[in-house]
């Protein structure tokens, strides 16, 4: 998706922007004010993959940076993205691109393979202050023995459906773990809940 040098350059651009406007962690619609986020989200090779998954009529729904600071207890609990968005259809795919190394130590993503085929799972409210998931919910009925780690080098990406169960552990490394999270929808999809 661009390689290590490109990812490091994009990470530097993101950090320069952070110095000017503050934290970009989970700041919605980053592609509307950062050229580098737009360029990564709209790369031809990325859009070709997205087209193979949801068809040729693609809407760039959202772009956020997911940042875990070093030596942090922050984690993301098991969840499904589509639970929160109130969309008419589930023709959706998310790309998570590493801008820094995403290792087990730095809290790379974990997924439950084929879990998207089970549809929506029950989410429960959590009061865990170290859970950085904005909605504060978690799926508790997850068989973690079936989870796979998704380590990535800078510039590599994973793609997952919005019903895929996924989570990530704390970053116990000495470096920031930075990823670009991009959601794509088929254009026939519309918002049904706000």
Report each predicted region and the residues it spans:
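Non-heme Fe(II)-dependent double-stranded beta-helix
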Residues: 1-78, 83-87, 124
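Aromatic-acidic/polar surface patches that form glycan- and anion
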Residues: 35-42, 88, 144-153, 173
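Short, surface-exposed loop/helix-turn segments at secondary-structure junctions
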Residues: 9-14, 80, 129-146, 174-176, ...
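Short, conserved beta-strand element in jelly-roll/cupin
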Residues: 79, 86-104, 151-154, 159, ...
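Double-stranded beta-helix
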Residues: 102-169, 189
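Non-heme Fe(II)/2-oxoglutarate
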Residues: 9-15, 157-159, 163-194
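Short acidic/polar capping segments at secondary-structure boundaries
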Residues: 65-72, 82-83, 90-91, 99-104, ...
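Residues that flank catalytic or metal-binding motifs in active/ligand-binding sites
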Residues: 33, 61, 91, 105-107, ...
């Amino acid at each position: 998706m661009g390689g290590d040098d490109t990812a490091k350059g994009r990470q530097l651009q993101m950090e320069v922007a952070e110095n000017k406007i503050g934290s970009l962690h989970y700041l919605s619609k980053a592609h509307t004010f950062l050229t580098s986020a737009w360029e990564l989200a709209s790369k031809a090779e990325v859009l070709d993959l997205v087209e193979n998954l949801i068809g040729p009529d693609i809407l760039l729904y959202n772009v956020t940076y997911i940042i875990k600071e070093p030596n942090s207890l922050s984690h993301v609990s098991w969840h499904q993205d589509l639970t929160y968005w109130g969309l008419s259809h589930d023709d959706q795919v998310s790309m998570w691109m590493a801008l820094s190394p995403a290792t087990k130590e730095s809290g790379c993503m974990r997924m439950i393979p084929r879990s998207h085929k089970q549809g929506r799972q029950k989410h429960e409210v959590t009061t865990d202050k170290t859970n950085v998931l904005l909605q504060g919910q978690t799926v508790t009925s997850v068989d973690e023995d079936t989870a796979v780690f998704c380590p990535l080098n800078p510039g590599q990406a994973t793609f997952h459906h919005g019903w895929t169960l996924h989570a990530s552990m704390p970053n116990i490394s000495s470096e920031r773990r930075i990823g670009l999270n991009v959601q794509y929808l088929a254009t026939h999809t519309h918002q049904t809940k706000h």
